[in-house]
């Protein structure tokens, strides 16, 4: 098989970086080597304001920053947030119930080396018309981990254009708003990894894939008539691994799991399950390896040599993991709690929505109490004592022997580093 030039470039770039420090323990896939703001400065978000000093918008407006939080709650935004290059956003550092950003979407276009963890991005019907809840049109090396994205007005989470080396893992992509109601486009030759995510309550594009893609251990629930996994539907060439996923029909589902493939979409498929009967039990079956079962794609006999997961779950294991841990799950908010309950109804609950009020909006979050941080370097005093740093000296951006900054070492310790 002749590989496309963009694919060869992408794989060469990844192979040169495999020995580099990964973004955080547990980072995988094409975007695993994003560096974020490791070589820059710390920015502590101290309020829930839309803009101004101490706000999240201000925090991501400049390059080379690691963003941590001394506040928890809902940040209501009027305009889209545009993220700069080499920014790390560590939502797990927020006290209380964490951070939800509500009211409009985010652009990560050209936000090279972004690292984003444990944050909720909820656009809503008041957001910019024709825009995604989270969109990437260009940029290289980004990883999104345990992110909950919902209520996009165009797509919910899309990656297009010249973007390359992107990973979305352990995340929830939910409830694109009607009448469009799309999970998202994943269409770049630069390489996108989708691992252990939940797509739920999107009429179509769960996701729609073109180009170079690894789709492993995801759960897709209650897609609508537009389609579940849409295989390109394009004259362009696509090369994908589709491994160990579970597709579960819900009340809105009226078409099969895979649609709109053609001879230009080359897919290596293995151990994907489909439960079409909406009977309140998880009792799906393995899809036979045939073009007809996979929407007309050209079935490949060998797996593409893309950066893969360290451990491939069975589809049943993927469902167990995703329902327990996907999204900003350090503390699950009311929205994600409802979504997981829908999945666990095994086909009897769920629906497409046009207004987030159906879900109770973003809900309320316990803001918690910020820990004492005498030197203001982002690491609480008690944690500094355990790390061996000085609570009275701004030293969180110094490098630990692991290669991460002390700030990253502390933040990484707050959440699990493995999934098996």
Swiss-Prot record:
Name the source's superkingdom: Eukaryota
What positions does the entry give for Ca(2+) binding?
275, 277, 279, 281, 286
From the UniProt entry, list the residue stretches annotated as the region Disordered.
Answer: 358-396
Q: Name one GO molecular function term.
A: pectate lyase activity
Glycan-linked positions: 49, 165, 202, 394
Its chief place of residence is: secreted
Which GO terms of type biological process are on file?
A: cell wall organization; polysaccharide catabolic process
Q: What enzyme class is recorded for this protein?
A: lyase
The places in or outside the cell where this protein is found are: Secreted
**Which reactions is this enzyme annotated as catalysing?**
Eliminative cleavage of (1->4)-alpha-D-galacturonan to give oligosaccharides with 4-deoxy-alpha-D-galact-4-enuronosyl groups at their non-reducing ends
Reported function: Pectinolytic enzyme consist of four classes of enzymes: pectin lyase, polygalacturonase, pectin methylesterase and rhamnogalacturonase. Among pectinolytic enzymes, pectin lyase is the most important in depolymerization of pectin, since it cleaves internal glycosidic bonds of highly methylated pectins. Favors pectate, the anion, over pectin, the methyl ester.
Family, as annotated: Belongs to the polysaccharide lyase 1 family.
Question: What name is this protein filed under?
Answer: Probable pectate lyase C
| Natural source organism | Aspergillus fumigatus (strain CBS 144.89 / FGSC A1163 / CEA10)
Whichever gene encodes this chain, its name is plyC
């Amino acid at each position: 098989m002749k590989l496309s030039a963009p694919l060869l470039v992408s794989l060469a770039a990844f192979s040169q970086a495999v020995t580099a420090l990964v973004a955080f323990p547990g980072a995988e896939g094409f975007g695993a080597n994003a560096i974020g703001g490791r070589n820059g400065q710390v920015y502590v978000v101290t309020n829930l304001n839309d803009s101004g000093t101490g706000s999240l918008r201000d925090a991501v407006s400049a390059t080379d920053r690691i963003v941590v939080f001394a506040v928890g709650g809902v940040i209501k935004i009027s305009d889209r947030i545009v993220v700069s290059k080499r920014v790390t956003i560590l939502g797990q550092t927020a006290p209380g119930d964490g951070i939800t950003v509500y009211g409009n979407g985010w652009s990560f276009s050209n936000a090279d080396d972004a690292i984003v963890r444990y944050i909720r991005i909820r656009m809503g019907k008041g957001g910019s018309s024709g825009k995604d809840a989270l969109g990437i049109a260009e940029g290289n090396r980004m990883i999104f981990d345990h992110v909950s994205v919902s209520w996009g007005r165009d797509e919910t989470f899309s990656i297009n254009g010249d973007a390359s080396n992107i990973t979305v893992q352990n995340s929830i992509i939910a409830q694109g708003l009607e009448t469009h109601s799309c999970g998202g486009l994943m269409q770049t030759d630069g390489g996108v990894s989708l691992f252990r995510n939940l797509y739920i309550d999107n009429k179509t594009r769960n996701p729609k894939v073109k180009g170079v893609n690894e789709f492993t251990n995801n759960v897709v629930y209650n897609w609508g008539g537009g389609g579940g996994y849409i295989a390109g539907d394009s004259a362009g060439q696509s090369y994908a691994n589709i491994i160990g996923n579970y597709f579960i029909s819900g009340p809105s589902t009226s078409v099969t799991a895979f649609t709109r493939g053609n001879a230009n979409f080359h897919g290596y498929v293995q151990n994907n399950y489909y439960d079409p009967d909406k009977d309140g039990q998880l009792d799906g079956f393995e899809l036979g390896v045939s073009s007809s079962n996979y929407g007309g794609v050209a079935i490949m006999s060998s797996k593409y040599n893309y950066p893969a997961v360290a451990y491939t779950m069975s589809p049943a294991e993927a469902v167990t993991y995703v329902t327990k841990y996907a999204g900003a799950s350090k503390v699950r908010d009311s929205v994600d709690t409802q979504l997981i309950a829908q999945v666990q109804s095994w086909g009897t609950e769920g629906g497409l929505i046009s207004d987030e009020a159906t879900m109770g909006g973003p809900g309320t979050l316990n803001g918690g109490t910020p820990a004492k941080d005498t030197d203001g370097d982002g690491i609480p005093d008690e944690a500094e004592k355990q790390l061996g740093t000085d609570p009275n000296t701004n030293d969180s951006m110094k490098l630990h022997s692991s290669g991460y900054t002390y700030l990253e070492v502390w933040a990484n310790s707050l959440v699990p580093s493995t999934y098996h």
